[in-house]
Every structure is written in structure tokens, then in C-alpha cells.
């Protein structure tokens, strides 16, 4: 109850919520007024905020229990270290299944909702090769490029992680819910920072993209027009110092081409992908036994962002 009550204090940043969580018990925290909170943090807010409704918090707790969702709190052992890199990391994330393994390489494979059949096939192809070589696939579970990336990992019987904009009991979009059980069976996870009963807002999608980039070591965009949400993910990734890749410039969309103009690297073929991962490419799609260490941080440190990965895996 205390955790959910504090997480409902939407006007506070994640680290401020954590400070309340660590220093107040439930009976005391529910007595705090906005003025008390302002005094505690030595700051004032521009407008009055409605404090959490205890009945709503009780209902949220029941949803968490009914869905058997897990909660990772900022600063806890279960909270992903990579996520701590982002601006204002969430106080709590709610998830089903598992969270990404920090010791493994993870790529965000994202793109537009509206993609051609050919681009959908290319997204699956690249994601499949990443997954079967030990790279965990992170994406936003949206229709289009996102779900194609997830499906590729599922088809390879590998782990993939879906970050959703809605709450854990209202997985969005509905048409992709049929993939949830298989995704979870294979050790993946559904992840969100949205609380039960929160009415979805447009900015929730940007918050979702922020988590996608935060959980990833590199970002690969297969198709993105100029107004694609995938560009937000890429820009956030660049802010974190991540490598950003785009598919063939003849097909990847104007938004992805613009990213290339700002330094994103082009990946045209699966062979290009294997070269980035420092793995020998075999035409039969069979990888030599002595090359299957792409998920080891030390083996990829000279290829992508190994130094950063070493830090967050400590």
C-alpha cells in the first residue's frame, strides 16, 4: 500500500518518491499534505495537486495481486541497473515474467506502426539473428515493427521484453495480447511504469519509449518516417551515448535517414549485423561454435558500447 500510495504522487520525481518511501511509514506518509511535501523537499510546485485516494490505492493493490505482477523499486537489487542511466528513472516498474539480464547484450529493435510486408520481413530477419546469438530484444509491443521484432525472438525460443504504455492489467494493443503467454513462457517479460486505472495519455507513449532506450545497449530502427515515435527512442538513446543503427537508407524512411545524417550507422544486410557483433557470418545461417559468445560483455566491448555495459553490469 505504501509503495502504491507514494507512486501515485505524480508531481514527484522518482528519486523523491524513493526518499519518502525510505523515510516514512504508511501511516505517516498518508497524512502528508502538499505543503508538508514541499517543506520536506524544500521546493514549491506551480499548482495544487490532488493527493492519492486510498480507495483507489486499495484497488490498485488488488490488481497487482490478482495479476501476480512483480514490482521493482528504484535502488533495489531487482531494479535494472541500465534503467538508472535515464533522466528521472521511475520509482517503480511493474512487470510480469522477468526483467532483462544486465550481463547480456540487449538491443531495442523499433520502427513505425505502418510498415510494408517487405520491411516486416526484414525486421523479423534481423531480430531473429540477434536473438539466436544471445542478444535480448527490447521493443514497445506496438503493431508494426515492434511486434515483428518480438515475434522473431519468440520464434527462436529466445527472450524478448515488451515495454507497454498502459498498466500491467491492460496490455496494449489488444491485438498483440495473443503473444503474451508465449513471450512469458520463454523467459521474457512485460514491463510498465503505469499504475492500474491510470487513464492513458499521449505522453505515456513517450515515457514507454524512454524505458525502451534505457533498457537497451543499442537501438536499431528498421523504418521510421519523420514523425515516428521510434525517433524519440533513438534520440533518447543518443542522449545516453548508445549506438543507433538504421536499416538500408533506400527503405528505412525519412526519419531514419535523418538519424543517419546525424551519425547513425546503416545496416543493409545480415552480414553487416554479424560484423558489428564480431561474429563470423555463415551463409547457411549456422554460426560456428567458437563464435557464439556475442552475449558476453567482454567479447563485444570493442564493438558496441562495452565500456558502458561493463559499468552497469557491476
UniProtKB/Swiss-Prot annotation:
Transmembrane segments: none annotated. GO terms for biological process: DNA-mediated transformation. InterPro entries: DprA. It comes from the Bacteria. May help load RecA onto ssDNA. NCBIfam families: dprA. Belongs to the DprA/Smf family. This is Protein Smf. It comes from Borreliella burgdorferi (strain ATCC 35210 / DSM 4680 / CIP 102532 / B31).
